[in-house]
C-alpha cells in the first residue's frame, strides 16, 4: 500500500509541468483578455490621464461630439400628398418663404426673404473676414446676421441688410450708438452648447484689436459673466426690456435668447416679460470655446426644445403673437422644415453657416495635423489656429478666407436649403412654408412620438404626457 502510494506520488511529480513549459503555455493561451472596458473606454482613459497632467477640465470648441442616441429631428418623416391632399407643382406654383419677426410691440418688425438666419458669433471667436463674409452672404440671401459677444463691427453693419445686435452678460463692446443702428436687439440669457455659463475667449485669440474693443488686456483668457449685471430674474428683466425699447424708440423688436434647459417655464417667463421673439438654442448648438463637459452633459435636445417652447406659448395664448426661433445643430432643409412644422417661425444657424464658409474643408491639411486635428473632424476652434482662417485672429491665417468667395458660398447654401424647405412644403400641399404643421409629420420612433405628440408611423397613436404633446392635440 505504502509502496503504491509512493509510486503514485512520484508519477504526479513527474507530470508537473516545468516553469518553462508553463510560460510557453501562457504565451500560447494568454490568461488576460484584450477586451476593452465598456465603462473605461480608450477615450475615457485618455481623458483621465490628460486631466491628471493638466489639473483642470478640458476646453474645446464646436459642440457636442456624442453619437446622436437621443431623439432628433431625424426621427420624424413628412407625409406628402396622396389622394387626401393635392401637391403643388415645383416650378409653376409658388411657395412663399417670407418671414416676419417681432410683430408684438415693435414699430418695425424684421422682414426676411427666408426663414433661416445667422446666429450670434462674436468678432474674437471669429475672424474679421468671417464676420464680414457672414454679413455679406446673409444680405445676398435676403436674411439677417447677428453680432455676438464683443459688440458690432462697423464693417458688419455696412455689409448686412438686417443686423441683430446681441446684448450679453459681459457687455463687452456695448455701444448705444451701434445698438440704435440695429434692426433688432437680442437679449441673451443662455446658449445651447453651454447653458448657465458665460462665454470664453482664450488668450491666443485676444489680439490687440480684440482687447481694445473689449477693454481688456491682450493675450489673457477672457471669461464672460454667467448672468447679467443689472437684472437677476424675470421681474428685473421686464425693466431691462423696457430700457432697450426706450433706447431704440420702440422701433425694433426685442428678442430673448435662451439655452435649452427648463424650456417650458423659461419661454413663458420671457414672453411674460415682454419679448417680441423668443429664441431657444438646443444642446446640439455650437460654441467657439467652453468646457467639454458642458457641451456633452448639459441642456436638452433641439427636438424637445421646440415642442416645449411652442406648448408654452400656446398655454399663454401668445403663439403667433410672440414668434419662436429655434437653433441648435440645424444642418439642412429637412431639419428646418421639420422645425417649422413643429412650431418654429424661423431657424438660426451657426456651425452650418461656418461650414458653408469652408470650416473643416480639406485645405492646408498639414496645419490641421499641427493642431492635432484632421479635416471633417476638427473641433479646435478655441486654439486660434484655424487652418482655413475662420476662427482665428492670426493675420496670415485670416487671409486664407477670401471674403467675397466665402460670402457667395454662404448665399448659395442659403438658397439651397430654402429650396429644400420649399420642396417639402410643396410635397405636403403648402404654398407657404409657414403653413407646415404637426399633421404633416409622423414619428419613426416611440421617443420622438412621446416628445413631439406626433403619431407613431403605422399606428396613428400619440404616446406621451409632457407639455410638448398636450398643447398640440
Language model region names:
Residues 351-431, 451-473:
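Ligand-binding clefts of soluble mixed alpha/beta catalytic domains
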